[in-house]
């Protein structure tokens, strides 16, 4: 996914190292304007985490999933 790769590259510029291990996506409603869900398993600065995102666009849902995972990892680092 080019959008996801570009986002991961941008995070790297902020010293947030994200390695995506697994990525899944699917529609959660039917029809032309279906909402999408995305799930990522990744390592953020060496911490294994999962993230999920839901949006009307699969690209936005994917970005939200990565943000969710990054937030989880950064919270663990702060503890």
Where would I find each of the regions flagged by the language model?
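Polyanion-binding surfaces on beta-sheet-dominated domains and ring/shell assemblies
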Residues: 1-79
């Amino acid at each position: 996914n080019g959008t996801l790769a570009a986002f991961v590259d941008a995070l790297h510029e902020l010293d947030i190292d994200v390695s995506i291990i697994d990525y899944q996506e699917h529609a959660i409603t039917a029809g032309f304007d279906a909402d999408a869900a995305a799930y990522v398993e990744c390592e953020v600065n060496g911490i294994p985490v999962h993230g999920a995102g839901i949006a009307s666009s699969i690209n936005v849902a994917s970005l939200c999933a990565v943000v969710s995972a990054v937030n989880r990892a950064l919270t663990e680092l702060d503890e």
